[in-house]
């Protein structure tokens, strides 16, 4: 796989263009809050874009009005936060959402978040889900 130095903000804008139709369909706002300066990571763009898209698509599925996407550099790391204003993740499900084949959607294969975690791990990063109003997904990647 090809790792290149990439501005995460650009990748996220790509993902937003790719999920725009879903946002419009559901009449949702997407609010990006990005650093003014590049947030650079060494990554396989195709894979990392897929990881982000999986989370953004989920957020758009559960949001009521808005999803907020933050991207910034913090203490030598790239921090990406994707939050929705939906019901949040049921506490009993939180420990399992990254498990392979686990899905809350009937008929959903549930490989989305497991694959996301795998991709983030390949980039020496972490992904963590929590609730703060709606669901919050935080991806932390090494800068480089």
Label the predicted regions.
Residues 66-76:
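Short beta-strand/loop element within the Bergerat-fold HATPase_c
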């Amino acid at each position: 796989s090809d790792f290149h130095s990439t501005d995460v903000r650009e990748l996220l804008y790509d993902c937003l263009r790719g999920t725009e139709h879903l946002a419009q369909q559901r009449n949702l706002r997407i609010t990006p809050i990005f650093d003014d300066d590049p947030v650079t990571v060494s990554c396989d763009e195709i894979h990392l874009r897929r990881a982000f898209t999986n989370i953004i698509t989920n957020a758009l599925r559960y949001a009521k009005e808005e999803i907020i996407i933050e991207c910034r550099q913090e203490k030598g790391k790239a921090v990406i936060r994707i939050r929705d204003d939906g019901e949040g993740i049921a506490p009993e499900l939180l420990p399992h959402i990254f498990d392979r084949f686990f899905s809350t959607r009937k008929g959903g294969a549930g490989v989305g978040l497991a694959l996301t975690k795998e991709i983030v791990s390949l980039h020496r990063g972490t992904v963590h889900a929590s609730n703060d109003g709606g669901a919050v997904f935080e991806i932390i990647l090494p800068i480089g």
